[in-house]
Amino acid sequence: MFLLHALDQTIKKLKAQTANILTLMNLSLGGFAIIAVMHGQLNLSLLLIFLAALADRFDGMVARKFNIESELGKQLDSMCDIISFGVAPALLLYQGILIEFGAPGTIFTVFYIGCGAFRLARFNISENNGYFTGVPITVAGCIATLSYLAIPYFHPVFFLSLMIILSLLMVSPIKMKKV
């Protein structure tokens, strides 16, 4: 009887942490994407960022389905998102093309990361009213990551411009309906 009770309690605790486990999977995939960039494996980094996006998509769904949304989960999600959709895509594009610009490439890579962090901090203190203010970092990060595939087809200035535009869109006052 004791064993069944202990097993039941363990299952309940695990269920309560399912969303956070997915969130940490997002973080892990983003971290591995950064390491892949550092080792020159840019295509692998691209794949890992998109897998992180899948984990990020499901963590919120799981939290709502099991009614386990929490302030801790919200904060953890933002910390993971800055890695997977801020740092990882920025470094992917930096190594892929922006490095050719020297200091401006470096500055706008860091600018993108800073705008992403600001966007997440603003989100964490705002009321949830069915709208986002500014483009979500997950959207900006996926666009930046996807643009890596276009490097052979566009002039390098396009990518520098894209990073600036995505950065400004993340911190813009534009209201976007949540989907």
Walk through the language-model features, giving the residues of each:
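C-terminal ends of transmembrane helices
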Residues: 8-9, 59-70, 115-129, 168-179
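Alpha-helical transmembrane segments of multi-pass membrane proteins
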Residues: 49-56, 111-119, 148, 163-173
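C-terminal membrane-associated helical module and adjoining short loops/tails
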Residues: 1-7, 11, 132-179
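Multi-pass membrane catalytic core of lipid/isoprenoid biosynthesis enzymes
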Residues: 14-24, 65-121
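Helix-coil boundary and interhelical linker segments in multi-pass alpha-helical membrane proteins
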Residues: 32-48, 83, 87-110, 146-160
